[in-house]
Structures are given as C-alpha cells and as structure tokens.
C-alpha cells in the first residue's frame, strides 16, 4: 500500500517530464528556406536586383535575417557575404540590390540566400535555415577574335571614389597596355582574355572627362578606350538663411558649394528643394542659391525648412527653423530731407515702411566728414527727425540713416544717404606765428612764418594774410602788407628800432583775431652758448634752464643745418612752466645736423634767445674726404694741409682726422701707430684729435724717397670713405741746400733789376746820358773829389790859346771839309801859331777834347757844323784847325769869353751828329764829291795836354779834328 503510494507520484512525474520534452521538440519552428524568383541587373549602374519569397510562412509578418552570398566565376569563389534584416510579409516578395565593383559584362556571378527568424512572435531559431539554390547572373558579352572591348562605358563617379575597368579581348589579341590621359596604368589578369584595371581615389581633372586609351602590342593594333566622368563631391548647402522685409514673402538664401556639373549632359547642376514640415509644402528652386517663399497671411509664425541638394550621385540636406518676427530685415528709409540752420546746425527728417503702430524700429543716424564718423540711435514708428549740431562752417557732410527691428534685432536695412554743406564764417582762431631775424647792411631782415589754420578754425577758404608793422618810437605811423594765400611766410626789411607786428588772416566772411609779435632792438644779435645734444631715432630731447620767472612761455624752433640762412623753419610753442620737451618729426633724417634755438616769450610778447643746441638723430661716417695739398716739403719732411674742408657740414660731428702714410721702410715713430688695412697692407697712422687742426708735418723721412698718404675724417660712427693714396717724393738734400742759396740770390738780383728798371732814367742820366754834359756829369764830380782838381776840366781855369772859328761870310763860298782833306784855301801856308815863352811863364795845362759834338762858335750868327773824322795822329802832332789870321780875328772880336761868365754859354754849345754828312752850300760840290761815310767819334775821357804838345804840325793827310787849346789864364 505504501509502496503504491510512493510509486504512483514518481510515475506521474516521469510521464509529465516526457510530455514536456516532446512538446518542446514539436513547438520549435521548422527552418524556412527562401526561394529566389527573379535576378535582374542594370548594366549602366552595375547593379544586380534580387527578388525572393519565404514559403510556408506561418505569420502574416515576421522579422527575419537573410544571409546573401555572391560568388564570381564559379560558386566556390565567394566574393561577397551580407546579412540583410527586413520584415517579411506573407505572399510578398523581398527585394535587394547589390552594386558590383566589376562590370557585369565581363564575368558571371552566382547568388544564393538562407534565412533566420528574428521575431518575438515566434520561437527563436537557433541556426540558419537551408540555402536556396544558386542563381546565375550572366551579363557577359561575347568578343570576336580580333576585337577588344572595355567596360564600363562613360562611367560617372565622384572624385575620390574607386573604379575597376574591365578589358575583354578576342583570342587573337595579346598584351594590351592602357594609359590614363598620358600616364600608363597596369592591370591584373582575370582569365586568359579578361583584364582588370583598378583605379583608386580618382581625381577631378576636367568637367569634360578623363580619357583611358588602350592598345594591343600583338594582334590588331586598334586603339580603344573609355571616358571617366569624374564629378566634384556634392556639398551640403551652407549659411542657409530666411528673412522677411514686408511679412509677405520669405527670402531664403544659401551658399551652394562647388558646382558638380559635367559636360555632355552626363550630370546637370545639382537641384535644390525647400520643404516646410508644418505646412507639408515642398518647392523646387529655379536658382542655385535662393528661393522666395510666399507667406500665407495669418497662417503661422514658426517655420521648419529642410533644404536638399541632389545630383545624379548623391543627396545632401540641411535644416533650419525660426520665428518669423525674429527674421525681419526692414527696407531702407525713404523721403530723407535736410534743412541747414546757420553755419553749425542741420535738421534731418525721414520715413520708414510701416509695419503697424505696435511695431517699433531702431534707426541709426550717421554723420561723416572725411574719415570722422558720428553715430546716433533713434526709435521710430512711422517717421523721425534728428538735429545735427556743432558742425564746422564751410564743410561738406554726408548724412546716413538705416533701421532695424527694435524688439528682435536681425539685420540693419540698407543706408539712405544725403549730402549737404555748411556756409562760411569768419576765422575763429589767431594764427600761430614766428619769425627769423638776421642782419644785413645795417638793417634787419625779418622773415615771418605762420602755420595754416585748421579747417575747423579757418571756417572758410583763406584769401589773404594782413600784416601791420608799427614802429614803437612812432606809434602813429604804421605800414600795411598783404600776403595772398596760400603763402605761409614773407620777408620784411626793418631798421634797428623796436617794432610791433600784428598779423591776421581773412576769408570771405571776415578776419581772424590778431597775433602780436614784438621785435626789440637786439633781436637777431643775441649771443648765447651753444651745446651739443644727441638725438634718438626720430626725435630730440630738448631741455634748458629758465632765465627769468616773468615769462609767457617758450618757443623752440629748428631747421636743418645749411649754408643758407633761409631754411624750412619749424617751431613749437610751450607753456611757461616747461623746461624740456621732445621734438619729433617725420622729416628728421640720419646724417643731417639740426640746429635748435630756445626763446623765452615775455608778457610784452618779446622773444629773447635763451640757448642754442645742435645735434643729429643718428651720426653717420663722413661722406667726403678733404682735398689735401702739400705746400712745402724738405728732404726729411713734408707738410699736409686741407684748409678748405668744412667740418660743419658733414654727416656727423668731426672728432678728428686719421692720417695714413706708407712707404717701403714702414718704420713708424712715435706718436705714429703701426696698423693694418683690410688688404693686410702695413702703414703708419696718426690720429689728429680735434676738427680745427687741419695741418700736419710728417717728419723723420728719408731724402729722395717715395711716400703715400691718405687723410680721412672720422665721427662717432666711424671714418670716412676709403680712397686711393696720394704719392709724394721727398727732394734731394744737396739740391735742397743749393735751392736755399740760389733762391735768395735770385730774389736779390730780381729786386736789383726791378729797382734799376724803376730808376733807369736816373741811372742813364747819371752814368751814360744820350748827350753827355760835362757840367752835369756826376762822374766828373766823383773824380774831382778824389784827384787833383788841376787834372779835372774846369772851364774857368782854362785859357784857350788857340781857337778855330769857322765863319760863313755872306757871298763867299762855303767852306767844306772832305774826309781827311782840306780845300786849297784852307790849307795853312804858315806854321801854326804856337804860344812862346814870352806869352807864358811856363807850360800851360790845357783841356783836350776829342769829341767834336760841341762848337763854341754858337756865338757867331753864321753857325755851321764841323765834320768830325778819326783822329789818327797823336796829341803832339795835332795843330789848329783855323789859320792864324782867323784866330787873330777871333781874338780881336772877343769871340772868346770866359765860359763861366754867362749861364747861356753852357747852353750855347751846338751838338753836331758825329755821323753827320758834310755841310756844303754848293750843290755842285755835293754832286761831284759825294759824302764819304765817316767813323763816328766818341766822347772820350778828357786829359791834360802838356805845353810842349800845344803846337804840333798839321799834316795834309791827317783827318780833321776839332781841337781847342785853352790857355790857363783865359777867363
């Protein structure tokens, strides 16, 4: 009983367990095998289209997973496996597409499918179902033995994609080679008559396509090929925006990106479609970058747009959503007017496009003149106005206005512009004036300078400048000058009196306030110290010591250093408590010296020079070397001079000069330094410290030696330019000493010649007169002073013993004397009369003349000439030229007189040319007896003739000589 009780439950459990196991086996779904109904392909797209169904489907809908396997060439060469999930409906075909990477025309493909249930409505399936049978995809074409084919034809693809080109050629064609444009490409052999060319990451070369050309090296050599149309990659639209200007339309715009159009109609420009999700409206744009969307009145405020770009290869989309009231872009203001109020004000009015009284716009007003802009904001419903104030007279202005939504700012409207001009008014500012004064011929030349007024100060076109010059000593008298614009300076010539100068400027509406300047007596003659300053890059730091506390301010003026007193003067006005300033100017240049003057201006408007300063913003090395001359040289030295070198007009302050000397010996004595040039040549250098020393004596040299020298100045920036050396040779020592002797002697001789030439007349009269005069002969006086006075001719001490006087009796024949002969009547028949002892106590010294140029017969009215001849006989042979009877007549008539009784006796001596022809009164005689040239007598030294020689015999053949024998006692 008990056992049965225990056994019965155990049996029941076993039966239940067996039932449960059997029910599980029975409830697991049977595997479903798909059945392929249709396999098609699209060769242009290289696409395989597959359709299949699932028989014995127990549910209306069932989620299933299909595994698709594709093989190429044969079923064992699997190239593609893909799982495809979809919902399968009873008695409805499932479709699937596959794109081949190899043209379908080149090779066969095989496809099969198996399924797996993946749905909660059915018990899960633990494994894949059975495979369907294989389906062949055969689009392969046949090729003739001598031909070749290439696929795909005119392929369209995107830049950066990959493509495989298939070559098919007949059995008679071998070794086919291909080129992409001009670049060769290599392929792989698929079978004996099919080759594949794989191109990766193709690039865009042209919208007309990229050519691929092929040719066989064996068999028919016909060229064949295809064209790849590579398109730019389609981009999604950028910066998509929509706005309204009148709440009637929405203007949507975007940036389309690159153009993907291809030629030959392979691909047109991408299309753009605008779809709004709330209204379910879609519109295709006729433009590539914009579309105008019509707003339905009162329809909606919120918009959600999708903009889609599409071409043959792909689609790109972008979304935008907004509130209409937040995208308001107002139209430009209209009816803008301007009213000029005086010279400094203008009122502008305008209107806006109405959006209702509850809609407020914010308008921006802009005033522009030149580069200056002023902006103001105004709230507007329908119309508004704005008053411009503080305008400049005689100025052209541009007024602008634009508006935007005041509640939700989106964009400003376009500007509306209006131009206007303000009228002129009198200048409002006095001129900034200054002066430059210098002396010339006892007067002052004053150059007045003034700076032009700013446009805001001139208040119109400046016409002229009026200058009034008032002499403080004569205040009622003044001079007026007018200088026409645009001149900014003028010159005045004033005396040394103090003056007041008043300057104003005028435009068409009046004159400016006057500027006053006072010139004191010493203006232009101030002597102050000058110091050197160093500038910085484009500026100078100027400082000075205040002179007095009673000052109205300071003026610093400056200009570039030049030899001309007139320069482009600049100045700067400073306050009374200022003792330093920085002067900057774009005109400052390196290597140019600038002179600064600091003036103190008193309350009386007088300017007093306080200090002078000079400097460079940057010193440069000298640009020019001095021209050196050698004024003097010796065997052991020579002198170098460069006096004409102006050190004040160089590119820097001249600190000194460097003198280089080189020779063969190259021995440098102190203070010379031995130095090297860049070309490694050795020379001696001497540093002349200071710019004023412009002379140097080079000493300790060798005679007759060649030296080379070179002189260059230097500044803080360095020495001057390198130039060629000048050669000099020292002279010989002996020739130099000889020159020292000869030169003074030559100078003395030249001086003597000059003095003699200067006193030539005096020397001639004293030493060798043209007409010797014994009474004026200084030689005689010299002899007289040194010798016995009895040996010197003294007329008053000589008494003539015998005189020959030739008289010309009227009616008688003129006596003529030939050369060396006498006429018959003149030949003495008696011996000449000779003084005897009875007449004289002893020998009487007499003067003997051999010069026949003087004749004492001047006292006779019948004057005549004597024919001189050479004196061949000695003194003791000479006789009287006159016969005794004539001599007695002379004595009787008192023809002989003391020579010293009358001064006229000196002048009564008749000069007869020593070369004169015979003087004859008979023409016949002249004809028959031509004159014979005679030797010219000369004035010879007088001598004392002894008494024993007083009466020599006269021979006929002797030449005639005029002889005078004077007795000692004759007065």
UniProtKB/Swiss-Prot annotation:
Classification via Gene3D superfamilies: Immunoglobulins
Residue stretches making up the Fibronectin type-III domain: 332-425, 427-523, 524-620, 622-733
A Pfam cross-reference name: LIFR_D2
Motif WSXWS motif per UniProt: ranges: 412-416
Membrane topology (Cytoplasmic): 759-971
Glycosylation: residue positions: 74, 97, 130, 162, 239, 271, 304, 323, 377, 491, 541, 577, 689, 722
Zinc as UniProt keyword: no
Record key words, sorted: Disulfide bond, Glycoprotein, Membrane, Receptor, Repeat, Signal, Transmembrane, Transmembrane helix
Protein location: Membrane
Record remark: domains: The WSXWS motif appears to be necessary for proper protein folding and thereby efficient intracellular transport and cell-surface receptor binding. The box 1 motif is required for JAK interaction and/or activation.
Name assigned to this protein: Oncostatin-M-specific receptor subunit beta
Protein species of origin: Mus musculus (Mouse)
Name of encoding gene: Osmr
């Amino acid at each position: 009983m008990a056992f049965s009780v225990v056994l019965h439950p155990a049996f029941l459990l076993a039966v239940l367990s067996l039932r449960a196991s059997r029910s599980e086996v029975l409830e697991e779904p049977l595997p479903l095998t798909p059945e392929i109904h249709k396999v098609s392909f699209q060769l242009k797209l290289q696409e395989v289209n597959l359709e299949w169904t699932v028989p014995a489907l127990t549910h209306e809908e069932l989620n299933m997973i299909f595994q698709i396997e594709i093989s190429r060439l044969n079923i064992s060469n699997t190239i593609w496996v893909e799982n495809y999930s979809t919902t399968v409906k009873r008695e409805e075909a499932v479709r699937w597409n596959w794109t081949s990477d190899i043209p379908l025309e080149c090779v066969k493909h095989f496809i099969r499918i198996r399924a797996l249930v993946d749905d909660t409505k059915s018990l899960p399936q633990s494994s894949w179902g059975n495979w369907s049978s294989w389906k062949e995809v055969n689009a392969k074409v046949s090729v003739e033995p001598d031909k070749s084919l290439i696929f795909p034809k005119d392929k369209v693809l995107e830049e950066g994609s990959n493509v495989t080109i298939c070559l098919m050629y007949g059995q008679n064609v071998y070794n086919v080679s291909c080129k992409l444009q001009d670049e060769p490409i290599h392929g792989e052999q698929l079978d004996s008559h099919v080759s594949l060319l794989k191109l990766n990451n193709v690039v865009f070369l042209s919208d007309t396509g990229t050519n691929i050309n092929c040719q066989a090296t064996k068999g028919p050599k016909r060229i064949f090929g295809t064209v790849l149309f590579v398109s730019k990659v389609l981009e999604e639209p950028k910066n998509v925006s929509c706005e309204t200007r009148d709440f009637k339309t929405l203007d949507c715009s975007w940036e389309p990106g690159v153009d993907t159009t291809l030629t030959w109609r392979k691909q047109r420009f991408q299309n753009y479609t605008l779809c709004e999700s709330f209204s379910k409206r879609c519109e295709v744009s006729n433009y590539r970058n914009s579309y105008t969307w019509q707003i339905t009145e009162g329809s909606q405020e919120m918009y959600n747009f999708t903009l889609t770009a599409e071409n043959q290869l792909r689609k790109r989309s972008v979304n935008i959503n907004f509130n209409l009231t937040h995208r308001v872009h107002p139209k430009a203001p209209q009816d803008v007017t301007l009213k000029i109020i005086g010279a400094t004000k203008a009122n502008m009015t305008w209107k806006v496009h109405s959006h209702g009284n509850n809609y407020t716009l914010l308008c921006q007003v802009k005033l522009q003149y030149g580069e200056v802009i002023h902006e103001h904001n105004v709230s507007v419903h329908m119309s508004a106005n704005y008053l411009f104030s503080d305008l400049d007279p005689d100025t052209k202005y541009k007024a602008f206005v634009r508006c935007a939504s005041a509640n939700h700012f989106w964009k400003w409207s376009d500007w509306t512009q209006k131009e206007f001009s303000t009228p002129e008014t009198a200048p409002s500012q006095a001129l900034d004036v200054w002066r430059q004064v210098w002396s010339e011929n006892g007067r002052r030349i004053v150059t007045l300078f003034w700076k032009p007024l700013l446009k805001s100060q001139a208040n119109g076109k400046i016409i002229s400048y009026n200058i009034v010059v008032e002499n403080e000593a004569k205040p009622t008298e003044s001079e007026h000058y007018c200088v026409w614009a645009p001149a900014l300076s003028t010159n005045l010539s004033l005396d040394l009196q103090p003056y007041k100068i008043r300057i104003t400027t005028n435009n068409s509406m009046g004159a400016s306030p006057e500027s006053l300047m006072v010139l004191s007596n010493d203006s232009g003659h101030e002597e102050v110290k000058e110091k050197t300053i160093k500038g910085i890059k484009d500026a100078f730091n100027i400082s000075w010591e205040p002179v007095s506390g009673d000052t109205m301010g300071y003026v610093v003026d400056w200009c570039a250093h030049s030899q001309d007193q007139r320069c482009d003067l600049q100045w700067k006005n400073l306050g009374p408590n200022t003792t330093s300033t920085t002067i900057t100017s774009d005109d400052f240049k390196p290597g140019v010296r600038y002179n600064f003057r600091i003036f103190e201006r008193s309350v009386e408007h007088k300017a007093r020079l306080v200090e002078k300063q000079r400097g460079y913003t940057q010193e440069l090395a000298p640009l020019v070397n001095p021209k050196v001359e050698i004024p003097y040289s010796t065997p052991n030295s020579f002198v170098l001079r460069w006096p004409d070198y102006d050190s004040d007009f160089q590119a820097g302050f001249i600190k000194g000069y460097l003198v280089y000397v080189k020779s063969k010996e190259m021995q440098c004595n102190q203070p010379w330094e031995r130095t090297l040039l860049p070309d490694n040549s050795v020379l001696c250098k001497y540093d002349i410290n200071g710019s004023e020393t412009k002379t140097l004596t080079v000493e300790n040299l060798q005679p007759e030696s060649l030296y080379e020298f070179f002189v260059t100045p230097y500044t803080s920036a360095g020495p001057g330019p390198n130039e060629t050396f000048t050669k000099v040779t020292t002279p010989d020592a002996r020739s130099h000493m000889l020159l020292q002797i000869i030169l003074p002697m030559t100078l003395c001789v030249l001086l003597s010649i000059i003095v003699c030439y200067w006193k030539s007349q005096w020397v001639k009269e004293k030493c060798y007169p043209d007409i010797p005069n014994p009474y004026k002969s200084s030689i005689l006086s010299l002899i007289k002073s040194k010798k016995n006075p009895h040996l010197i001719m003294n007329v008053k001490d000589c008494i003539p013993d015998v005189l020959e006087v030739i008289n010309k009796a009227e009616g008688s024949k003129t006596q003529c004397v030939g050369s060396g002969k006498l006429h018959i009547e003149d030949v003495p028949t008696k011996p000449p009369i000779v003084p005897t002892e009875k007449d004289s106590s002893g020998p009487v010294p007499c003067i003997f003349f051999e010069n026949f140029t003087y004749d004492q017969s001047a006292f006779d009215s019948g004057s005549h000439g004597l024919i001189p001849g050479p004196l061949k006989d000695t003194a003791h042979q000479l006789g009287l030229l006159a016969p005794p009877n004539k001599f007695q007549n002379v004595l009787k008539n008192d023809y002989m007189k003391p020579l010293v009784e009358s001064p006229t006796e000196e002048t009564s001596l008749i000069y007869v040319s020593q070369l004169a022809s015979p003087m004859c009164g008979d023409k016949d005689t002249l004809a028959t007896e031509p004159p014979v040239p005679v030797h010219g007598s000369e004035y010879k030294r007088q001598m004392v003739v002894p008494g024993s020689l007083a009466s020599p015999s006269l021979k006929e053949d002797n030449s005639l000589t005029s002889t005078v024998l004077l007795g000692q006692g004759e007065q």
